[in-house]
């Protein structure tokens, strides 16, 4: 069995359920035991009219739009459902770096992959919204096809047609990170965050090796095109829902992880958060919700 087919088999076995936490008072080796939501969420920041982004991700891609959160200071977070993952959109902030271009142009969160059952229906929605039809290409050794398009802000999106047409296959969302040092990034997502490393595969789209990490129905994939790319630290990031954000903060201190925003409480939402950076400055945002907090072991 090829590594690619092994990855597909692993994804087919994905199920959705909260993960248990370690006993009270124990310090876990990584964040894994306090990851509560059996998926990750992903956010993108943009600099175009919000309506254009909402039309693309909702009307064209067909993601279900949820309520928009107003988190204060005039900041709205638009939310879309993609399988078990929430895909979030918000305007750019001023204290981060942004780089134009695609997956090879900068380090950062450079690609989001969504799964679709029907190429014809997806293509029809592109045409109905006045957009060129995506150009699909076969992935050698599989029955899948992919197309690369840009959203209205110029950020790349991969459209994957999956022949399985099962909920498990269609619920998968893949977050593509371009990194400067694969070993440092692998260590962060494996040894600090506690994601399951699936092993490298040859990347049929961008070339080289791709290192993937699984949490429930969400994949984080790492690619590297050298150490000298400019850093994009603002265009996107990953959110994890956890049962104990204090433990995340303690682990971050112990492992010398960069803190982007310290522990804080978001008024009106019963939400406690800490924002951390991976080795390339990509935001990893840990949120303790009231529901997750109640799940802690006694």
Q: What is the predicted function of each stretch?
A:
Residues 6, 20-25:
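Short, low-complexity disordered leader/linker segments with a strong preference
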Residues 34-36, 43-87, 144, 176-219:
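Core segments of cupin and vicinal oxygen chelate
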Residues 1-9:
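Bacterial N-terminal signal peptides that target proteins for export
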Residues 23-35, 37-48, 77-81, 98-171, 176-177, 200, ...:
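Vicinal oxygen chelate
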Residues 28-29, 64-103, 149-152, 156-163, ...:
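Conserved short beta-strand elements that form part of the metal-binding/catalytic scaffold
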Residues 9-18:
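Bacterial N-terminal signal peptides
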């Amino acid at each position: 069995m090829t590594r690619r087919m092994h990855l597909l088999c692993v994804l087919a076995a994905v199920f959705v359920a909260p993960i248990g936490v370690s006993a009270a008072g124990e310090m876990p080796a990584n964040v894994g035991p306090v990851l509560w939501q059996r998926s990750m969420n992903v956010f993108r920041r943009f600099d175009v009219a919000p309506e254009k982004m909402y039309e693309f991700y909702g009307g064209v891609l067909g993601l279900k739009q949820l309520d928009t959160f107003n988190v204060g200071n005039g900041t709205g977070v638009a939310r879309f459902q993609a399988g078990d993952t929430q895909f979030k959109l918000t305007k750019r902030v001023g204290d981060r770096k942004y780089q134009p271009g695609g997956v090879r142009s900068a380090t950062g969160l450079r690609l989001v992959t969504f799964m679709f059952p029907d190429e014809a229906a997806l293509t029809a929605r592109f045409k109905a919204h006045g957009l060129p039809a995506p150009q699909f290409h076969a992935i050698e050794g599989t029955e899948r096809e992919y197309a690369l398009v840009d959203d209205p802000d110029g950020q790349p999106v991969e459209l994957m047609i999956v022949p399985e047409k099962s909920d498990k296959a269609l619920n998968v969302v893949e977050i593509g990170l371009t990194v400067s040092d694969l070993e440092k990034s692998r260590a962060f997502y494996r040894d600090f965050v506690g994601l399951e490393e699936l092993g490298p595969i040859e990347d049929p789209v961008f070339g080289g090796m791709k290192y993937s990490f699984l949490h429930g129905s969400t994949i984080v994939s790492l690619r590297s095109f050298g150490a000298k790319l400019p850093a994009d630290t603002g265009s996107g990031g990953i959110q994890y829902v956890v049962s104990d954000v204090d433990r995340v903060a303690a682990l971050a201190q112990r492992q010398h992880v960069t803190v982007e925003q310290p522990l804080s409480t978001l008024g009106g939402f019963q939400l406690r958060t800490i924002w951390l950076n991976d080795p390339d400055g990509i935001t990893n945002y840990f949120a303790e919700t009231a529901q997750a907090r109640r799940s802690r072991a006694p």
